[in-house]
């Protein structure tokens, strides 16, 4: 049958050719976490099936986006919702919504024409981070504050938004006070909670707390498509965010296209995630960490402990330390050997580094194993390889 005559249902039937193998791409075991550079999470089988089914039929994109948003808003207990091209896209589109609201302007006016416009976004100095480039795409100017008095005094006619980085461990102003002061000045509050599920209830905790907009990554804890995300919040702001997004032409979000497969996949992932239990997930992750630790218990001088970060990636991680005078290999060298091995294994990037990663404590003497993105049985593969590398250097 020729390609032009083959129905879509036939084209996607079966597993098909393995293009990773065809392209010579190395498959890995992900003992790191939901990092973008490692293709984030694995979609569960029901989500994969929903994506494949969505690929079989064309639809009207805005009808799909609208109905998906309405469905998600009901499930996630908020006024309105939309599927975005990841959390960074949600940050840009939410900021664009606040900019166009404050300036009573059209999407095509941003960000090329900000001269004389209202474009100030308040943020705690301790909440500045690499990802705030997604906000700066809209032509905003950050105004940094540290104390509640600074914050109160920073509002003026040019203030369009107050931004909060949910996972930040520093900063003097908590969520409730951040919201209260902004709302006193009739300014919307945006919370970047990209990596902050589980727990499942965080999907509605922050909007119910009073944040006007909240961004989540779709391809992390929710286990949706890697290039999908969620923007939740006030109906008027979600409407403006939608107007600033693809498929509309002259707007800041034109390059942030979300395909039908990603929209359906994100909805399916939310359905799947809401069917899970926080307790069951945490118990399974704890078991994986315990199994790895038990397999390493007789490595000389080795000590292990399990740490759960306080906000982002709030799941058990295994931290391993040992005397490098007895086990003569550094954590960074262990990570390199596991990466080069077969199968190739990636450890958490906090391994062997003085700075922690996403709330995980670490130093040059610590191996960090993320267990929550492991597939069944992979925990013991990681355990065996760690043991091989460590014991071969004693």
Regions found by a protein language model. Give the residues of each.
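Flexible, glycine/charged-enriched surface loops at secondary-structure junctions
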Residues: 61-66, 80-81, 253-257, 276-285, ...
